[in-house]
Each structure stands twice: as C-alpha cells, then as structure tokens.
Amino acid sequence: MRVLVQRVTSAQVTVDGEVVGRIEPNPQGLVALVGVTHGDDDATARALADKLWRLRILDGERSAADLGAPILVVSQFTLYADTAKGRRPSWSAAAPGPVAEPLVDAFAATLRELGATVATGRFGAHMHVELTNDGPVTLLLES
C-alpha cells in the first residue's frame, strides 16, 4: 500500500459536479491519496492509517491526532504505475477494484476509529481533487 500524504489548508473532491468529500481544516489538515497493491490486507491498511494519524507533519511538529486535523482520503491506483518501459504506464502492480476498495474503506474506517474526522472520494469514479498544499509538504508512506 502506498499513501501519498499532503498537508493542506483546504481540500475537496467533486464527482459529476457534486462535492462528495470536503475538509475545512483550522488551520491544517491532510489529504491521503491511497493506492493498493497485490498482497495488501486489512492489517496493512490499519497500520498505515495509524501511522498517518500519528505522523508529526503539522505545525509545531504535531500530528493530526494531536490537533484533531481532518483527513480527506482518496483512492488512487495510479500510485502503482510502472513507467520503466515505453511511454504507456502499466497498472499491473495495482490491485483490482474488488480487492482495493475494501482496503481503502478499511484505511478510512481505521482513521475514524482513531478519532479522525474523515471525508472521502468515490472509489472508481473520475474525480476532481482540489487542494491547497501547505508548505508544501508531501510525503510517501509505504508498507
């Protein structure tokens, strides 16, 4: 599993003109773009969610857990693109939807269980993600 994390001051996801997820942090929140690969499981999703929740990347070296910062979770299979050969990416390392969707859901559910305010995109949809990156701070978490 890969989670591309961005520290933000605002973020929202729109599908077909409808806002399906939005966070309005005060002052900061996180956007987590989540990619799932073969071999990932519920334990992987839970461990990375816990790491994200406690990761000290907000102002004052504090975490989302410390500040109650909201998190927008968006599935993104393209995090597993293989661009080593040719000009067309291969997606073979990305888990198929029926495998990936429950794990992205488990990731978001774990964050909620830990106390996070979580908004989400819509799995499998063509999404428009708008965010204001703060810093900028962008990190890649991997299992």
Swiss-Prot record:
Its EC number is 3.1.1.96. Its main location: cytoplasm. Keywords: Cytoplasm, Hydrolase, RNA-binding, tRNA-binding. A motif (Gly-cisPro motif, important for rejection of L-amino acids) lies at residues 135-136. The keyword Cytoplasm applies. One of its GO terms (biological process) is D-amino acid catabolic process. It is found in: Cytoplasm. GO terms for molecular function: D-tyrosyl-tRNA(Tyr) deacylase activity; Gly-tRNA(Ala) deacylase activity; Ser(Gly)-tRNA(Ala) hydrolase activity; tRNA binding. It catalyses: glycyl-tRNA(Ala) + H2O = tRNA(Ala) + glycine + H(+); a D-aminoacyl-tRNA + H2O = a tRNA + a D-alpha-amino acid + H(+). Pfam families: Tyr_Deacylase (PF02580). One of its GO terms (cellular component) is cytoplasm. Gene3D superfamilies: D-tyrosyl-tRNA(Tyr) deacylase. It is an enzyme of class 3 (hydrolase). Homodimer. An aminoacyl-tRNA editing enzyme that deacylates mischarged D-aminoacyl-tRNAs. Also deacylates mischarged glycyl-tRNA(Ala), protecting cells against glycine mischarging by AlaRS. Acts via tRNA-based rather than protein-based catalysis; rejects L-amino acids rather than detecting D-amino acids in the active site. By recycling D-aminoacyl-tRNA to D-amino acids and free tRNA molecules, this enzyme counteracts the toxicity associated with the formation of D-aminoacyl-tRNA entities in vivo and helps enforce protein L-homochirality. A Gly-cisPro motif from one monomer fits into the active site of the other monomer to allow specific chiral rejection of L-amino acids. Belongs to the DTD family. This is D-aminoacyl-tRNA deacylase.
